[in-house]
Amino acid sequence: EFAGKVKLIYIDPPYNTGGDANIFTYNNTFNHSTWLTFMKNRLTIARDFLSNDGFIAIAIDHYELGYLITLTDEIFGQENRLGIISVVNNPMGRNQAKYFSTVNDFMLVYSKNNEFAQFNNVILNGDFLNTFDCEDEQGKYKLQNFIRVGGGDANLKVNKQTFWYPIYVSPDFDKITLDKKENFFEIYPITSTGQERTWKLSKNSTEKILHELIAEKGSNGVISIMEKYRVEKGQKVPTIWSDKKYNANHNGIRLLEKIIGNKNFSFPKSLYTVLDTVKLLTGPNDIVLDFHAGSGTTGHAVLELNKEDGGKRQFIMVEQLTEHINVCNKRIEKVLGLNNLKSSFIYFELKKYNQSFIEQIENTKEAIELLQIWEQMKVKSFLNYNVDIKKQDEHIEEFKALTLAEQKQ
């Protein structure tokens, strides 16, 4: 039903650290090959859920980063890898670290098809947003010099002649034109140091945005052409997210405790890490999927963003661990209540997929039949994460020595 309809998949899978960050009953100490199989099966299916312009964002730490990149390049295509984001989620670092004190984890972002992928024009950095200190009837903006100062020598007059032309300003600074007029000031893109550079746009393009240009006279008498940079243009999103809102202690652990009183959930993501990902990659009517729902941060983020921008995004969260399900459901119900949201939250339990195998095991009369059922289960059943298939197969002779009743157990 949802194949090809999901705009964003956000997942925070078990990191396979082998350390103290064990996530409840997840087997967080897989060997690399088992962990990769665990991930590959899910990611291969996940790709089919994405729309052609869809994205997947995967949180991971350094331990499996290299392995995961190789796997996701294979599934989604290296050409669709849009970025590896470093999220500073623990700015104080890990005091017990033997070598480097880790302050970040990572987020891999892939598109399903980069020909259709498009980021939203958003500003994720609060400090940058505060620089938009002007406002008119069209909204917030800030003034930027219209001279192209970046790009080194490439944007010098001698190397880009078509971007060197005069802009004319009326004596009262009220009118700006590209047509030469009597008594108008003639302004060229020359810096305060006398360097001849270029304007940001060609003459034809500048003609179309003259209404967004302002002339200012400095204390030194120099006239500058300034551009209204609109907040709607957003910003190029950097690959390092270091804003304090991404702190997983303040906006993950403590936030969850504040909402539902839970102090025992290990390392929930900062709400704003997920919220900003959803803000960047989805529209107001899109579907977001998270099949490692954990504490329900993704659902919470979607609800908060809908409240912020009036969107009608929907989320689907999938979780199989009882500890997580209880936390997740309670959190979403609380958020809906606290925000007086009219959104509905529907909770389903999947039909016991393995029930047919249980019935086959109970009805079998021969040990050989049990072994045949086991081979089918390895391919078709949903086995618990703690089941090590390889180890089970290594002890097959010991299994054969058991009585039929013991084998069924």
Enumerate the language-model features and the residues they cover.
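Accessory, often C-terminal, charged low-complexity segments
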Residues: 2-3, 7, 20, 42-47, ...
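Conserved proline-anchored active-site loop of SAM-dependent methyltransferases
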Residues: 4-21, 72, 288-303
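Mobile active-site "lid"/loop adjacent to the S-adenosyl-L-methionine
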Residues: 7-9, 13-37, 42, 51-53, ...
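Short coil/turn segments at secondary-structure junctions
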Residues: 26, 30, 94, 257-261
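Phosphate/oxyanion-binding active-site loops and adjacent basic polyanion-contact surfaces
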Residues: 31-39, 265-270, 324-326
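Conserved beta-strand signature within the Rossmann-like core of class I S-adenosyl-L-methionine
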Residues: 54-58
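Glycine-rich adenosyl-nucleotide cofactor-binding module
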Residues: 250-285, 304
